[in-house]
Amino acid sequence: MNRTHLAFSKTGLALATLVMISACATQPPAPTEDRSVAEQVRAPAAEQTRGLQVYPLRNPAVTELSQAALAAEQAGDLDQAALLLERALRIQPRDPELLQHMAEIRLERGEWDQAENFAARSFDVGPRVGQICQRNWRTVALARERLQRYDEAANARERLQECQVEPPVRL
């Protein structure tokens, strides 16, 4: 009886240890392919900062929510990032950066129609030059490619060129 009790105790201890270790496991990051979609939008715009850039003024609460959304996105929690951006958009619904960030989150989630819609809304209320404009049209182009609307994607890539405006020469 002691041997049986000892065997059950060892088995129970092993199972308890296994359960505790498995509770420490983290969720796997989002697939690399999905993450690279938004980077295809952001990276080229960041590299082309020579031209004229336009940035709207922001509410401090919106700035905080936007930064938290970026941190959640970088941690791989796209649902939390989208939730935080939705809250920020309730405060400032016509903020082109927020709308574009939401478009990029939708790209990462594979929600091509929504990504295109958010990018178009961002362009409608945002600047017609600079990084935001470039990110808008890259998002639209990528979303249309994923939706197999290749002619429309090519049109979006042409519009992208209009976003690059050189600042005036200062003497």
Kindly give the residue locations of the regions a language model identified.
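Bacterial Sec signal peptide processing site at the extreme N-terminus
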Residues: 18-45, 171
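TPR alpha-solenoid repeat register
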Residues: 98, 132, 136, 169-170
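Alpha-helical segment of the N-proximal tetratricopeptide repeat
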Residues: 55-83
